[in-house]
């Protein structure tokens, strides 16, 4: 199958979001689609799959004009879109999810479970994975749920598969499994549109790359004929010569101390962070980094150990006590744990500091609005106003709202768990710059990141975890990818 999207444009009211877009999609090819959040990538794919119509232009499939009325019609034609937020029902089994709305019935109108099981088993065999058809989706890992979504595509003679940030929540092993599946699909002649911000993935698995910016296609070329610097320059419209901004903070006295922290997930964790310091936490998935931070913040209970701020021991049994002590925690899952998507920007930012705006028993909305406006401007949150629903913002702007929420409590220590996950190149740099500004004001920062170049580029010092223990610390001079990975895999 060959698809040609020609001169596609799209406007929502007076707001033009796509203009004169040309995009070729070929069978047996992995085509990367890159661009900052808001560039128009998802809008273009939603037009292709029939979620809404284009305002202009045409789509040709094998040289014939074709427009889909809805995503179901596109799926019937062999074109599937796996969104970043997966379309599964957690309380239903794998089999029920696969055939929801496309049930197979016998001549008497009764569900033909045997036929559905046979078809589902065949789909997973084609993917080279084994998944229990009777298990509830909610009990599967994110990687397994993703395989269910891909298997669902196989039920309709898959020809084109669109994947939006597919590795954002996967472990390293699940990511490699996905890459293996993509290679298999490519060998079968399936065309794949791969939307991602992760440069290393683009150069590892894609054949060509299209860069979008502000609703326009900037360039399309073979992946092997470009490089990271060129792609970044085309995505943001300027050269980012220094991807990680220079840090000028003075590192001073110890502010935060953790001594011999233990739970069932980690043992005897001890470290300290100084005023103005960014301490990175590296390690493989499952090493225990997030679990340590959740315990420090009072989400999970410590079995033993001591937490100190400015030399004073703290009792932290819940997040409220952690916030009162001056600890801010940006969690790795911003949508489920960091934000209330149905709340406004203002309501989200003021959540942990609501008491500061209550005077004589009443909430001072005017003061809160001014406070939120100032924070939003400082963090360059792109929104219509502070009353806009957070769920309607781009990933980068949502992350800035979470950061604003914790900056708003004037933290004595700030914990950031995967702060740039699912965030575009321009927003990443803004977050790095903000971290530097906080460090310059003396805030100690603890940053978990699975992106090795990021942690090497941002952290002053790195703690590397392996199987629930700190395997070692590396200073700026010692920190290389090789040294980090050696400690992360249990080497000395």
UniProtKB/Swiss-Prot annotation:
PROSITE patterns reported for this sequence: ABC_TRANSPORTER_1, ABC_TRANSPORTER_2, RBSA
Entry EC number(s): 7.5.2.7
Transmembrane segments: none
Keywords of the record: ATP-binding, Cell membrane, Membrane, Nucleotide-binding, Repeat, Sugar transport, Translocase, Transport
The keyword Transmembrane helix is assigned to this record: no
SMART domains: AAA
Reaction catalyzed: D-ribose(out) + ATP + H2O = D-ribose(in) + ADP + phosphate + H(+)
GO molecular function: ABC-type D-ribose transporter activity; ATP binding; ATP hydrolysis activity
Statement: the UniProt record of this protein carries the keyword Phosphoprotein: no
Binding of ATP, residues: 35-42
Subcellular location: Cell membrane
Domain ABC transporter: residue ranges: 3-239, 249-492
A GO CC term assigned to this protein in UniProt: plasma membrane
Membrane disposition: Peripheral membrane protein
Assembly, per entry: The complex is composed of an ATP-binding protein (RbsA), two transmembrane proteins (RbsC) and a solute-binding protein (RbsB).
Function statement: Part of the ABC transporter complex RbsABC involved in ribose import. Responsible for energy coupling to the transport system.
Family stated for the protein in its record: Belongs to the ABC transporter superfamily. Ribose importer (TC 3.A.1.2.1) family.
PANTHER family according to UniProt: CARBOHYDRATE TRANSPORT ATP-BINDING PROTEIN MG119-RELATED, D-ALLOSE IMPORT ATP-BINDING PROTEIN ALSA-RELATED
Protein's name in the database: Ribose import ATP-binding protein RbsA
